[in-house]
């Protein structure tokens, strides 16, 4: 600004002999210099006063929020008789972390839960985000001899509620089998129920959650019902065999099969 002022003062010493038109040209040129100087000065101040402007702002990319996998089940999911870190959903989380997948596992297992009890508490569970939902209920119904039609109705209600609240969520149904204590027909109908539900709802199915564990004393606790530490590892493998397909479909990438401990 001092430079511009000096230029204007210098006009006083311009000889009066200059033609009026020439003096006008000089005055116009100096005016343009003045306007440009003021504009640049204001821009400098604006950049200084606005540290959040594009010129000064550092772009920081925040990590994407993790997707949620909910395991909704009974004592097998809850890890009855095991340390918390030995339950199969925790083993699934470890597998996911080893592959650097952006998912977190929520263990919503409750010991002794029936399909009716699950249907009663599902609304509370659905208050949190759900991207993948694994339904593991029905075993306690079978042990109590609850009619298969009633169990199926409750499981269908749970599936309907999940789909209604989170239509983009992917569901996985864990199949279960029961010994023929209640009769062979009951055992057959019970086993078929899971296949029917999976087909009717177009969802993934784990044919038998306890494959390789059920009836094997080596992999069960003393009660002969709940998996021990080694049994839980096998259950995790059974679950991962289906879950990885769901995640592969969502992420369109390859996964290594199996577990390593």
Report residues per predicted region.
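C-terminal motif of bacterial Sec signal peptides marking the signal peptidase cleavage site
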Residues: 36-39
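Bacterial N-terminal signal peptides that target proteins for export
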Residues: 3-28
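Alpha-helical cap/lid subdomain in secreted, periplasmic
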Residues: 119-261
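Bacterial signal peptide processing site
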Residues: 41-43
